[in-house]
Amino acid sequence: MKKFDEYPILAVTSDDESYPFGMRKMSNNSVIYYKGDISLINATKNIAVIGTRKISDRGRKLAYETGCILAKRKITLVNGLALGCDAEAIKGALSEGGKCIAVMPCGLEQVQPRLNYRLAEQILEKGGCMISEYPVGSSIQKYRYVERDKVQSEISQGIMIIEADENSGTMHTAEFAMRQHKRLACYYHKMIELSNGNLLLENSGKAKVIKTQSDLEEFIDIVGEEKEFQQLTLL
């Protein structure tokens, strides 16, 4: 079993065919660093599954089950490997043999958060990928989390929000998704303490509200049918 440190850190430039299509179109960064199979980004449909670190019991269940469903549908899961919703979604996807892409806000010689070190190894073991805009030695800075949130949207065709506070990093990704004309969805929650961001999106009419598994399946179908880089009309 390979350890995280045994996977080489490689780089790809914007003139290489394996450079993420979405970032070529929307990002000013000409170099991306990665571990694992970067071709995965362009080869599959990707949905970012994101949410709060302070996850509720219901949010934990929804994140895990969403990851499972995406894996069964052969959709690659994208997020920032954060504690809470991100990690649970990854665990669900990996449990069904799915592929995951984790976007780091730092150099790839480290895993952020450190608590998800083993989960990062599992992503790579299962044929997934970890990417970063930052070279080895780049420290963790607050603004880099916001830039990471932008990348999550750039490399995804759809964004699914499990539960989020309205002032969270998750909502940064939602805002980027709207600017980039990406498909956006969020789960409906009766209890809004940890999900007032979901309520904000629901009331805005700019996200598909997921109340049932059939709603989720419909969202996946819509994302799966989209042509690459088509300018999308928000749901």
Which stretches of residues belong to each language-model region?
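Glycine-biased, small-residue-rich flexible motifs in mid-sequence functional cores and linkers
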Residues: 2-235
